[in-house]
Protein backbone atom coordinates (compact mmCIF):
# COMPACT_ATOMS: atom_id res chain seq x y z
CA UNK A 1 0.00 0.00 0.00
CA UNK A 2 1.32 3.45 -0.96
CA UNK A 3 0.86 6.15 1.66
CA UNK A 4 0.89 9.67 0.25
CA UNK A 5 0.48 11.25 3.63
CA UNK A 6 0.52 9.89 7.14
CA UNK A 7 -0.01 12.04 10.22
CA UNK A 8 0.15 11.04 13.89
CA UNK A 9 -0.77 13.58 16.56
CA UNK A 10 -1.41 13.28 20.25
CA UNK A 11 -5.05 14.32 20.49
CA UNK A 12 -6.12 13.40 23.96
CA UNK A 13 -4.49 12.64 27.30
CA UNK A 14 -6.39 10.64 29.89
CA UNK A 15 -5.05 10.28 33.41
CA UNK A 16 -6.41 7.01 34.77
CA UNK A 17 -5.84 6.09 38.38
CA UNK A 18 -5.08 2.38 38.54
CA UNK A 19 -4.39 0.02 41.40
CA UNK A 20 -2.22 1.14 44.32
CA UNK A 21 -2.20 4.73 43.08
CA UNK A 22 -0.43 3.71 39.88
CA UNK A 23 -1.05 6.47 37.31
CA UNK A 24 -1.52 5.29 33.74
CA UNK A 25 -1.32 7.94 31.02
CA UNK A 26 -3.25 6.88 27.93
CA UNK A 27 -2.61 8.74 24.70
CA UNK A 28 -4.83 8.87 21.65
CA UNK A 29 -3.49 9.26 18.13
CA UNK A 30 -4.98 10.06 14.75
CA UNK A 31 -3.78 9.03 11.31
CA UNK A 32 -4.67 9.93 7.73
CA UNK A 33 -4.04 7.92 4.58
CA UNK A 34 -4.68 9.34 1.11
CA UNK A 35 -5.24 6.75 -1.58
CA UNK A 36 -6.20 6.94 -5.23
CA UNK A 37 -9.70 5.64 -4.61
CA UNK A 38 -10.38 6.79 -1.03
CA UNK A 39 -9.21 8.71 2.02
CA UNK A 40 -8.89 6.86 5.31
CA UNK A 41 -8.97 8.67 8.65
CA UNK A 42 -8.69 6.95 12.01
CA UNK A 43 -8.33 7.55 15.72
CA UNK A 44 -7.20 5.03 18.34
CA UNK A 45 -5.78 4.72 21.84
CA UNK A 46 -2.12 3.93 21.24
CA UNK A 47 -1.23 2.88 24.81
CA UNK A 48 -1.14 -0.88 25.26
CA UNK A 49 -2.06 -1.40 28.92
CA UNK A 50 -2.57 -4.99 30.16
CA UNK A 51 -6.19 -5.61 31.10
CA UNK A 52 -7.55 -2.70 29.07
CA UNK A 53 -8.67 -2.67 25.43
CA UNK A 54 -7.77 -0.95 22.19
CA UNK A 55 -10.46 0.71 20.10
CA UNK A 56 -10.03 2.09 16.60
CA UNK A 57 -12.60 4.35 14.93
CA UNK A 58 -12.18 4.75 11.19
CA UNK A 59 -13.76 6.88 8.47
CA UNK A 60 -13.39 5.85 4.82
CA UNK A 61 -14.33 8.59 2.35
CA UNK A 62 -14.85 7.48 -1.23
CA UNK A 63 -14.83 10.21 -3.92
CA UNK A 64 -17.85 10.79 -6.14
CA UNK A 65 -15.72 9.66 -9.08
CA UNK A 66 -15.65 6.13 -7.65
CA UNK A 67 -15.89 3.56 -10.42
CA UNK A 68 -19.24 1.81 -10.46
CA UNK A 69 -17.66 -1.56 -11.21
CA UNK A 70 -15.92 -1.50 -7.80
CA UNK A 71 -17.77 -2.14 -4.51
CA UNK A 72 -18.49 1.05 -2.56
CA UNK A 73 -18.75 -0.61 0.86
CA UNK A 74 -15.54 -1.90 2.39
CA UNK A 75 -14.79 -4.44 5.10
CA UNK A 76 -11.97 -4.21 7.61
CA UNK A 77 -10.29 -6.25 10.33
CA UNK A 78 -8.07 -5.28 13.27
CA UNK A 79 -5.22 -7.45 14.57
CA UNK A 80 -2.72 -7.06 17.41
CA UNK A 81 0.78 -8.38 16.79
CA UNK A 82 3.93 -8.82 18.82
CA UNK A 83 6.77 -7.81 16.49
CA UNK A 84 8.72 -10.95 17.33
CA UNK A 85 5.79 -13.22 16.36
CA UNK A 86 4.02 -14.01 13.09
CA UNK A 87 0.58 -14.84 14.47
CA UNK A 88 -1.83 -12.20 15.84
CA UNK A 89 -2.49 -12.10 19.58
CA UNK A 90 -6.00 -10.66 19.23
CA UNK A 91 -8.25 -9.82 16.30
CA UNK A 92 -11.62 -8.26 15.59
CA UNK A 93 -13.90 -7.19 12.74
CA UNK A 94 -14.91 -3.57 12.17
CA UNK A 95 -18.63 -2.76 12.24
CA UNK A 96 -20.59 0.30 11.17
CA UNK A 97 -21.23 3.00 13.78
CA UNK A 98 -24.36 4.07 11.91
CA UNK A 99 -23.07 7.65 12.00
CA UNK A 100 -22.19 8.12 8.31
CA UNK A 101 -24.32 10.91 6.84
CA UNK A 102 -23.13 10.56 3.23
CA UNK A 103 -23.48 7.50 1.04
CA UNK A 104 -19.81 7.81 0.06
CA UNK A 105 -18.68 7.88 3.71
CA UNK A 106 -18.31 4.74 5.79
CA UNK A 107 -17.49 5.03 9.52
CA UNK A 108 -16.51 1.90 11.41
CA UNK A 109 -15.43 0.88 14.91
CA UNK A 110 -13.55 -2.08 16.31
CA UNK A 111 -12.27 -3.02 19.75
CA UNK A 112 -9.98 -5.81 20.93
CA UNK A 113 -9.23 -6.87 24.53
CA UNK A 114 -5.76 -6.88 26.06
CA UNK A 115 -4.82 -9.74 28.36
CA UNK A 116 -3.77 -8.75 31.87
CA UNK A 117 -0.83 -11.14 31.38
CA UNK A 118 0.70 -9.25 28.43
CA UNK A 119 4.44 -8.72 28.91
CA UNK A 120 6.57 -5.76 27.91
CA UNK A 121 7.53 -6.01 24.25
CA UNK A 122 7.13 -4.25 20.91
CA UNK A 123 3.55 -4.45 19.64
CA UNK A 124 1.68 -3.00 16.68
CA UNK A 125 -1.79 -2.98 15.14
CA UNK A 126 -2.56 -4.18 11.63
CA UNK A 127 -5.71 -2.93 9.91
CA UNK A 128 -6.70 -4.72 6.72
CA UNK A 129 -9.25 -2.99 4.49
CA UNK A 130 -10.88 -5.03 1.73
CA UNK A 131 -12.88 -4.02 -1.32
CA UNK A 132 -14.76 -7.16 -2.21
CA UNK A 133 -12.26 -9.96 -2.73
CA UNK A 134 -9.76 -8.04 -4.84
CA UNK A 135 -8.08 -4.96 -3.44
CA UNK A 136 -6.49 -5.06 0.01
CA UNK A 137 -5.07 -2.11 1.97
CA UNK A 138 -2.91 -2.72 5.05
CA UNK A 139 -2.25 -0.11 7.72
CA UNK A 140 0.32 -0.54 10.51
CA UNK A 141 -0.18 1.46 13.70
CA UNK A 142 2.43 1.76 16.47
CA UNK A 143 1.69 1.09 20.14
CA UNK A 144 3.43 2.02 23.38
CA UNK A 145 3.46 -0.60 26.14
CA UNK A 146 2.64 0.57 29.67
CA UNK A 147 2.96 -1.88 32.54
CA UNK A 148 0.25 -2.35 35.17
CA UNK A 149 0.54 -4.12 38.51
CA UNK A 150 -2.18 -6.40 39.82
CA UNK A 151 -3.05 -7.38 43.37
CA UNK A 152 -2.78 -10.86 44.86
CA UNK A 153 -5.08 -12.14 47.58
CA UNK A 154 -6.08 -15.31 49.41
CA UNK A 155 -9.78 -15.83 50.09
CA UNK A 156 -10.77 -18.42 52.72
CA UNK A 157 -14.04 -20.19 51.89
CA UNK A 158 -16.40 -21.85 54.35
CA UNK A 159 -17.98 -25.22 53.57
CA UNK A 160 -20.92 -23.65 51.70
CA UNK A 161 -18.74 -21.55 49.38
CA UNK A 162 -16.27 -24.41 48.97
CA UNK A 163 -19.12 -26.59 47.70
CA UNK A 164 -20.16 -23.89 45.22
CA UNK A 165 -16.62 -23.32 43.96
CA UNK A 166 -15.93 -27.03 43.47
CA UNK A 167 -19.35 -27.82 41.98
CA UNK A 168 -18.85 -30.02 38.91
CA UNK A 169 -22.53 -30.74 38.31
CA UNK A 170 -24.06 -30.90 34.84
CA UNK A 171 -26.35 -28.01 35.82
CA UNK A 172 -23.42 -25.69 36.49
CA UNK A 173 -21.66 -26.87 33.32
CA UNK A 174 -24.78 -26.02 31.31
CA UNK A 175 -24.92 -22.55 32.89
CA UNK A 176 -21.28 -21.91 31.96
CA UNK A 177 -21.86 -23.11 28.41
CA UNK A 178 -24.91 -20.86 28.00
CA UNK A 179 -23.05 -17.79 29.25
CA UNK A 180 -20.06 -18.48 27.00
CA UNK A 181 -22.33 -18.79 23.96
CA UNK A 182 -23.80 -15.37 24.75
CA UNK A 183 -20.41 -13.73 25.30
CA UNK A 184 -19.09 -15.25 22.06
CA UNK A 185 -21.92 -13.64 20.07
CA UNK A 186 -20.84 -10.66 17.95
CA UNK A 187 -23.96 -9.07 16.49
CA UNK A 188 -22.85 -6.35 14.03
CA UNK A 189 -26.23 -4.61 14.37
CA UNK A 190 -25.99 -4.29 18.17
CA UNK A 191 -24.64 -0.74 18.21
CA UNK A 192 -26.62 0.31 21.27
CA UNK A 193 -24.25 2.82 22.87
CA UNK A 194 -21.21 4.85 21.82
CA UNK A 195 -20.95 7.24 24.77
CA UNK A 196 -18.79 6.73 27.89
CA UNK A 197 -20.35 4.33 30.38
CA UNK A 198 -21.32 5.06 33.98
CA UNK A 199 -20.63 3.12 37.17
CA UNK A 200 -23.52 0.80 38.14
CA UNK A 201 -23.38 2.06 41.73
CA UNK A 202 -22.63 5.35 43.46
CA UNK A 203 -20.37 3.54 45.92
CA UNK A 204 -16.60 3.86 45.60
CA UNK A 205 -15.86 1.20 48.24
CA UNK A 206 -14.00 -1.49 46.37
CA UNK A 207 -13.45 -4.84 48.08
CA UNK A 208 -11.75 -6.49 45.08
CA UNK A 209 -10.40 -5.27 41.77
CA UNK A 210 -10.27 -6.47 38.21
CA UNK A 211 -7.23 -8.64 37.56
CA UNK A 212 -6.69 -9.72 41.16
CA UNK A 213 -4.69 -12.94 41.27
CA UNK A 214 -6.68 -15.05 43.71
CA UNK A 215 -6.07 -18.14 45.77
CA UNK A 216 -9.23 -19.77 47.11
CA UNK A 217 -8.51 -21.63 50.36
CA UNK A 218 -11.11 -24.38 50.72
CA UNK A 219 -12.56 -25.56 54.00
CA UNK A 220 -11.09 -29.04 53.36
CA UNK A 221 -7.53 -27.70 53.28
CA UNK A 222 -7.17 -27.71 49.50
CA UNK A 223 -6.96 -24.61 47.29
CA UNK A 224 -7.20 -23.34 43.72
CA UNK A 225 -6.03 -20.27 41.83
CA UNK A 226 -8.21 -17.91 39.83
CA UNK A 227 -8.26 -14.53 38.09
CA UNK A 228 -10.86 -11.96 39.17
CA UNK A 229 -12.70 -10.75 36.07
CA UNK A 230 -14.39 -7.64 37.47
CA UNK A 231 -14.68 -5.14 40.31
CA UNK A 232 -16.42 -5.89 43.61
CA UNK A 233 -18.22 -3.08 45.43
CA UNK A 234 -18.84 -3.57 49.14
CA UNK A 235 -22.40 -2.27 49.35
CA UNK A 236 -25.27 -3.31 51.65
CA UNK A 237 -27.74 -5.91 50.45
CA UNK A 238 -30.62 -4.25 48.60
CA UNK A 239 -28.56 -1.36 47.21
CA UNK A 240 -29.56 -0.04 43.79
CA UNK A 241 -27.77 -1.48 40.76
CA UNK A 242 -28.06 0.54 37.55
CA UNK A 243 -27.30 -0.17 33.90
CA UNK A 244 -23.84 1.14 33.01
CA UNK A 245 -24.94 2.02 29.47
CA UNK A 246 -27.70 1.66 26.89
CA UNK A 247 -28.26 -1.90 25.77
CA UNK A 248 -30.33 -5.06 25.61
CA UNK A 249 -30.71 -7.58 28.42
CA UNK A 250 -29.55 -10.93 27.02
CA UNK A 251 -29.50 -12.91 30.28
CA UNK A 252 -31.35 -12.54 33.57
CA UNK A 253 -31.43 -15.72 35.64
CA UNK A 254 -30.05 -17.75 38.50
CA UNK A 255 -26.54 -19.21 38.18
CA UNK A 256 -25.03 -21.52 40.78
CA UNK A 257 -21.73 -19.65 41.15
CA UNK A 258 -22.86 -16.04 40.54
CA UNK A 259 -26.37 -16.15 42.01
CA UNK A 260 -28.97 -13.90 40.41
CA UNK A 261 -27.17 -12.54 37.37
CA UNK A 262 -27.80 -10.04 34.57
CA UNK A 263 -25.94 -9.60 31.28
CA UNK A 264 -26.47 -6.60 28.96
CA UNK A 265 -25.30 -6.27 25.34
CA UNK A 266 -23.98 -2.77 24.47
CA UNK A 267 -21.93 -3.10 21.28
CA UNK A 268 -21.02 -6.01 19.00
CA UNK A 269 -19.14 -8.39 21.30
CA UNK A 270 -19.29 -5.99 24.29
CA UNK A 271 -21.28 -7.00 27.39
CA UNK A 272 -21.68 -5.88 31.00
CA UNK A 273 -22.32 -8.44 33.76
CA UNK A 274 -23.84 -7.96 37.23
CA UNK A 275 -23.55 -10.77 39.79
CA UNK A 276 -24.71 -11.85 43.27
CA UNK A 277 -27.95 -9.86 43.09
CA UNK A 278 -30.76 -10.17 45.62
CA UNK A 279 -33.46 -9.04 43.18
CA UNK A 280 -33.68 -8.63 39.40
CA UNK A 281 -35.87 -5.84 38.03
CA UNK A 282 -35.42 -6.59 34.31
CA UNK A 283 -35.89 -9.66 32.17
CA UNK A 284 -34.27 -11.09 29.07
CA UNK A 285 -35.18 -9.05 25.99
CA UNK A 286 -35.67 -5.75 27.83
CA UNK A 287 -33.92 -2.63 26.52
CA UNK A 288 -32.30 -0.34 29.08
CA UNK A 289 -30.77 3.12 29.18
CA UNK A 290 -27.77 4.36 31.14
CA UNK A 291 -28.73 4.72 34.80
CA UNK A 292 -31.88 2.58 34.62
CA UNK A 293 -32.50 0.60 37.81
CA UNK A 294 -32.01 -3.05 36.87
CA UNK A 295 -31.49 -4.87 40.18
CA UNK A 296 -30.79 -4.81 43.90
CA UNK A 297 -27.42 -6.00 45.19
CA UNK A 298 -27.06 -9.06 47.38
CA UNK A 299 -24.85 -12.00 48.32
CA UNK A 300 -26.27 -14.86 46.24
CA UNK A 301 -24.05 -17.54 44.76
CA UNK A 302 -20.39 -17.70 45.78
CA UNK A 303 -20.08 -14.68 48.06
CA UNK A 304 -18.38 -14.11 51.40
CA UNK A 305 -20.57 -11.05 52.06
CA UNK A 306 -22.95 -8.55 50.41
CA UNK A 307 -21.43 -6.94 47.33
CA UNK A 308 -21.92 -6.14 43.66
CA UNK A 309 -19.66 -7.76 41.10
CA UNK A 310 -19.48 -5.64 37.91
CA UNK A 311 -17.70 -7.13 34.94
CA UNK A 312 -17.09 -6.12 31.31
CA UNK A 313 -16.45 -8.61 28.51
CA UNK A 314 -15.18 -7.83 25.01
CA UNK A 315 -14.99 -10.69 22.51
CA UNK A 316 -15.39 -13.02 25.52
CA UNK A 317 -12.33 -11.63 27.35
CA UNK A 318 -12.67 -9.66 30.59
CA UNK A 319 -11.56 -6.01 30.40
CA UNK A 320 -10.95 -3.57 33.28
CA UNK A 321 -14.37 -1.90 33.79
CA UNK A 322 -12.97 1.61 34.36
CA UNK A 323 -11.66 1.64 30.79
CA UNK A 324 -15.25 2.01 29.58
CA UNK A 325 -15.89 5.02 31.82
CA UNK A 326 -13.71 7.01 29.39
CA UNK A 327 -14.67 8.09 25.87
CA UNK A 328 -13.39 4.77 24.54
CA UNK A 329 -15.25 5.07 21.19
CA UNK A 330 -14.06 8.67 20.63
CA UNK A 331 -17.65 9.81 20.24
CA UNK A 332 -17.96 13.49 19.33
CA UNK A 333 -14.26 13.90 18.50
CA UNK A 334 -13.51 15.45 15.11
CA UNK A 335 -10.74 13.31 13.64
CA UNK A 336 -11.40 13.71 9.90
Q: For the regions a protein language model found, what residue spans apply to each?
A:
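Residue-level detector of functional hotspots within protein domains
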Residues: 5, 24-26, 34, 40-44, ...
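Detector for methionine-enriched segments
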Residues: 1, 58-59, 108, 197, ...
Amino acid sequence: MKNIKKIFVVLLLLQIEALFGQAITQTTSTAKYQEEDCNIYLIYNDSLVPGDAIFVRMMIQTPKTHKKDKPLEKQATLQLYRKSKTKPIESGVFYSTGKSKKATNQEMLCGIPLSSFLEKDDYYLLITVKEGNDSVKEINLPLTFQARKFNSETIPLDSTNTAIKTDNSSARAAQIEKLNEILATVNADAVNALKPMASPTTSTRYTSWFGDRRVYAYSNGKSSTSLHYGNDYGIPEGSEVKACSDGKVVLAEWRNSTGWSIVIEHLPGLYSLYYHLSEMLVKEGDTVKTGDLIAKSGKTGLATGPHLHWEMRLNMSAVRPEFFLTNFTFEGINYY
